[in-house]
């Protein structure tokens, strides 16, 4: 756990801020570019919110608190945010939570729509000031609007937590003022501190939760009928790909195991476990394997994934959204870590394979870190260390347990 108040931590954060601002010290053009970005964001989102106020202003029951939660990132990100959200739910048991996700339908995989949970459609961000509190969750936790009078009226016991949260957010205001840009820098800070990804959310939200928490999804999600896919138990699931909303531009993600390795692994696995069906899952950014028993790439809905994974004897994957989803499933995963750090993303319940042949380059150079090696290699050197024979040995050991 990070001691956020220590002088060492404060200096480390100041170092990042100084590095980000470095080129601006001697260049008026760079300083103007930063100002332009802040002004553009202010105007763009301000106009967008005003339009939402005019045309899509929600009518909410004034007898209850209404909390807007904007969950940024892909399915895996949203799955991890559920830890923070459950902690917030404990503090506000009677509030109505409204979920808006950047990744379409992600909330439907994680939350059951009822009188206390409203799943909003994708599209434009709802008008934030229509709610009593609006928060953005990514690596950070940012309160973008709060109606203090309403909180005082309907949830006075929450005020100390809110006050502490806002004071902490003020201390990290440099990162939060443009969190779309600087969340990556905050993520790198967590990495070098040896912390887990949710550590910043825990601090900024002032919610006391276990960053390694696991649990279960609602039965209506977990036990959904997926018999129509014709799967026969026992089966294992494979996945190779990243968030479907990411534009791959024909590239292969560095965090994905090469197709030839998958092919060899499946051949060896089938020889050793002929009675276990091999099922491939995936979305638009996943290649289709013709050597598996059942390929559901592009054929299964996002909403069916929890039930499909829950029925699996074992899931095998790179670090991905499906792996993060196992936090809330009975299924364990064998995870091949490549260019993302296990210290940040690994779940203790899973079998996490790591390599020190190279480092972890996540969040460097913007989105290109997904597909382009900064050191010029054609593929991730960490991922190259996992041979099909080695992975089969790990999988066999788990299946025999």
Please name every model-derived segment.
Residues 2-401:
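Catalytic machinery of carbohydrate-active enzymes
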